Amino acid sequence: MIPSGLVYLLYPLGFLASLFFGSAFSIQWWLSKKRKEVYAPRSFWILSSIGATLMIVHGTIQSQFPVTVLHVINLIIYLRNLNITSSRPISFRATLVLMALSVVFVTLPFLYVNMEWMASPNIFHLPLPPAQLSWHLIGCLGLAIFSGRFLIQWFYIESNNTKDFPLLFWKIGLLGGLLALVYFIRIGDPINILCYGCGLFPSIANLRLFYKEQRSTPYLDTHCFLSAGEASGDILGGKLIQSIKSLYPNIRFWGVGGPAMRQEGLQPILNMEEFQVSGFAEVLGSLFRLYRNYRKILKTILKHKPATLIFIDFPDFHLLLIKKLRKHGYRGKIIHYVCPSIWAWRPKRKRILEQHLDMLLLILPFEEGLFKNTSLETVYLGHPLVEEISDYKEQASWKEKFLNSDRPIVAAFPGSRRGDISRNLRIQVQAFLNSSLSQTHQFVVSSSSAKYDEIIEDTLKAEGCQHSQIIPMNFRYELMRSCDCALAKCGTIVLETALNQTPTIVMCRLRPFDTFLAKYIFKILLPAYSLPNIIMNSVIFPEFIGGKKDFHPEEIATALDLLNQHGSKEKQKEDCRKLCKVMTTGQIASEEFLKRIFDTLPAV
């Protein structure tokens, strides 16, 4: 493809390109060290562009297609970094099109002739046997990884609007550079040995600078990072911020939260709503988004170093994050609010809690016993619902507003999400209609959101449930206190019915996939699944939980008829009163545990 005489230009061109690349990284490293942070000056991109242009010519002369095409891609990225801060930056799409056209333009000459993918000039006639295919694959992989670091940097600048380098850039550069160096030593290419050998030093130097900066940055005593991934955690977080502010008004709160936490002054880096998924299938479908959010939280904490981290519930996500933070050297105080259900499944998580936490805040009375023989500090705060429900004042006119019948009430709480309602409400309606109560009672459904009212109405109509009404979630406590009994989907709502002393039957229809995983993979087989039964270690409420083969509406209908007997209802109410007493015994006041956190911050 190129006249053979030009092969003697290889070394001067390659050496000159290496000088430009070396100068670019030397300037970048010197300025970064001066500024005490990883930094990419404009001169870096100019010098790198010149070096890439020379390497494109070098690769073309040497018939090295991978070298040529990867430097073409990198050249476009260098130019994009120069362009993004100009007065007239081109769009991401235009950059992508330009890159694709450049790759096609460079590839065509190589396709036209019978070229070698990774030819070696061997001007010095070194006694090296021909490299096997496996060596060429290693070389191509190393070059792809080494050049791929700029694709990562390009994605970083497009999403963050900054020309700086992410940590992953230097890690990828070090790995790819090592593979490429080993390959070029094998084929005896002195210019690329020089180029990629020297190219390791910027990665090592910048990684050293990054970790040195991370270790030397002081922790911010007045900063508290909080994270909640679910609505229940958001409510806990909002009340916690309220308590902290009353004692420590100078604390700044930021992190991940929902409306309750934001209302109390949390400055969000992400909104809680981005994490709301339920069931194994939904989690699998949201893995990329969850991982992206995980990386953002991790990097933000390590960069700003708040002295206190409080993670609220959402254990699978938060425990992964906590482990990674400790691995990266975070030495501030880490608190987890709400103990993961280690008593139900995956007990090995207890070890993670003991190794990485400074304090665990508990909301269930029996959980303190799980950590009796460990060094982990635990604090039993009690469940926030106990105080909330005991202080709740009913709205007297709610029946006139929502009900058009004086019949006694059977209440239904099918769940808070669309999938929960679709699976559970139909069974609840069928159970009611198959019981004797359908002749004497009305069926009232608590709706978690107005957007689900249509689904509820369609289900009631399809099942022919005539004496039925829908009321908003805000009036659920009024409904619990006024109904004869309730059908409730297993979850927090069951604890609410218990604390309101509402006779209840617990049920939950699982998806087939969730049923399979729960039974055969994770083997979650417990004597009880609802919190009142677990806390009291006895059957307060009957439970119907599982897939289609595990229970039928007729069985729930029979349980409804049994519950309607006066003695059964009074027995449940008495057990609920005992539950309230158990849950209020041994609680620590908020002022006491907050002083343990903020008055004893570690010297970091």
UniProtKB/Swiss-Prot annotation:
InterPro entries: Glyco_trans_19 (IPR003835), Lipid_A_biosynth_N (IPR011499). It is an enzyme of class 2 (transferase). It catalyses: a lipid X + a UDP-2-N,3-O-bis[(3R)-3-hydroxyacyl]-alpha-D-glucosamine = a lipid A disaccharide + UDP + H(+). GO terms for biological process: lipid A biosynthetic process. Pathway: Bacterial outer membrane biogenesis; LPS lipid A biosynthesis. The keyword Glycosyltransferase applies. The keyword Lipid biosynthesis applies. Residues 221-604 are annotated as: Lipid-A-disaccharide synthase. GO terms for cellular component: membrane. GO terms for molecular function: lipid-A-disaccharide synthase activity; phospholipid binding. Its EC number is 2.4.1.182. Keywords: Glycosyltransferase, Lipid A biosynthesis, Lipid biosynthesis, Lipid metabolism, Transferase. It comes from the Bacteria. Residues 1-220 are annotated as: Unknown. In the C-terminal section; belongs to the LpxB family. NCBIfam families: lpxB, PRK01021.1. This is Lipid-A-disaccharide synthase. It comes from Chlamydia pneumoniae.
